[in-house]
Amino acid sequence: MLFEGLDLVSALATLAACLVSVTLLLAVSQQLWQLRWAATRDKSCKLPIPKGSMGFPLIGETGHWLLQGSGFQSSRREKYGNVFKTHLLGRPLIRVTGAENVRKILMGEHHLVSTEWPRSTRMLLGPNTVSNSIGDIHRNKRKVFSKIFSHEALESYLPKIQLVIQDTLRAWSSHPEAINVYQEAQKLTFRMAIRVLLGFSIPEEDLGHLFEVYQQFVDNVFSLPVDLPFSGYRRGIQARQILQKGLEKAIREKLQCTQGKDYLDALDLLIESSKEHGKEMTMQELKDGTLELIFAAYATTASASTSLIMQLLKHPTVLEKLRDELRAHGILHSGGCPCEGTLRLDTLSGLRYLDCVIKEVMRLFTPISGGYRTVLQTFELDGFQIPKGWSVMYSIRDTHDTAPVFKDVNVFDPDRFSQARSEDKDGRFHYLPFGGGVRTCLGKHLAKLFLKVLAVELASTSRFELATRTFPRITLVPVLHPVDGLSVKFFGLDSNQNEILPETEAMLSATV
């Protein structure tokens, strides 16, 4: 018994020694990791590097970021201030909040900073994209792509977008159970990108498979760039390969069949604009370009669409005020009419309250956290040095949350953007849902157009109610969205705002 007791004590002592050793090893390695990055400060600059933590060796604070969501940024901003250092997705990073700080970064493109997304994002989107290009190449690509989002182009997309949204809402209303809004919004924006923007005639079965693959691609765009079996990065690479193969097939079929088209889609305009600028696009450039267009139209717009529906659910007075505006303009149309082309750009631009609603959704629920840059030369920001070679992320969402020009920043209040109040008029960098400077989002007008049409159709043709007791928690990765997707039951409305019976709804769906 004595020896057995000694064996137990010995085992516990050994275990305790191991735990102490591991703890000490982690503490020492973490301290060395901090010193490793502290040594990269620019010795010629007397200012200190921003405060913050670099986390653990190699992984940094990526785990904390993924688990804490919005709490990660807010807790560190509270502890370290508007400019702090961290280590995310395999690289050192300085996160920046505040209009003046963000302005310096956005206006410093090409001489202080240059765009650089995380390595996983760069590799998965491809080298031929607008977002990954710099300097003259970036300027030339923006000129080519700008034709896709011109006023004339948006006017030609509008009837098709409206019809896709009408069909989708009709399907949601005819569904006997509640739907997952975020998942369905992703399908809607994906369908819009494929059918309307790119003009691809992909069979429904193939489109469903392509959507699943694209979902896998998007889920891993922001992942640790570690190419190992079963890693998120490897899954993203595999999804990209499948997508590229499917896109090449669709592009070749589209180029061979040009008959019977009643409008020029984005891919047509991209090819045409490229030729106008003296360049013939290669197949690889076309594949990367279409992949980027889908990415731009898909994830962020689905996020904003879900946020729009959630806020209309939370604030019925906003929805009713929106309906009043539509009635005043004579466009609160019948839910039983699938007519295409009843909206025009000038009509939408005249809906002032609708514009305020969309702006407030984008202020309070900006789909992406911010943008990434790499530092070309050391500069000063908020009393700290931002060393050459480091990465910087300017925070859109936190800049909105801390902007002094907005009263009651956490309250959903569309009237803050009304002509009477115009809280966004003081300082252009307090409100920047689409970024700013030379890299302002090219597709921002298309995104706002889509959201406005969706809001008009929701107010005109649908009643909807939350199918759960409480509203879900919000997560931020890869874009802002409800953790459960937002479960909502939809009901169709007729021209008198009366609920359409399920049998009638089914008959209407069958005629489309």
UniProtKB/Swiss-Prot annotation:
Highly expressed in brain, particularly in the cerebellum and pons. Heme binds at C441. SUPFAM superfamilies: Cytochrome P450. It is linked to Radiohumeral fusions with other skeletal and craniofacial anomalies: A disease characterized by craniofacial malformations, occipital encephalocele, radiohumeral fusions, oligodactyly, advanced osseous maturation, and calvarial mineralization defects. It is a peripheral membrane protein. The keyword DNA damage does not apply. CDD domains: CYP26B1. One of its GO terms (biological process) is cornification. It comes from Homo sapiens. PANTHER family: CYTOCHROME P450 26, CYTOCHROME P450 26B1. Its cofactor is heme. The gene is CYP26B1. Its EC number is 1.14.13.-. It catalyses: all-trans-retinoate + reduced [NADPH--hemoprotein reductase] + O2 = all-trans-4-hydroxyretinoate + oxidized [NADPH--hemoprotein reductase] + H2O + H(+); all-trans-retinoate + reduced [NADPH--hemoprotein reductase] + O2 = all-trans-18-hydroxyretinoate + oxidized [NADPH--hemoprotein reductase] + H2O + H(+). This is Cytochrome P450 26B1. Gene3D superfamilies: Cytochrome P450. Keywords: Craniosynostosis, Disease variant, Endoplasmic reticulum, Heme, Iron, Lipid metabolism, Membrane, Metal-binding, Microsome, Monooxygenase, Oxidoreductase. It is an enzyme of class 1 (oxidoreductase). The keyword Cell inner membrane does not apply. It is found in: Endoplasmic reticulum membrane; Microsome membrane. InterPro entries: Cyt_P450 (IPR001128), Cyt_P450_CS (IPR017972), Cyt_P450_E_grp-IV (IPR002403), Cyt_P450_sf (IPR036396).
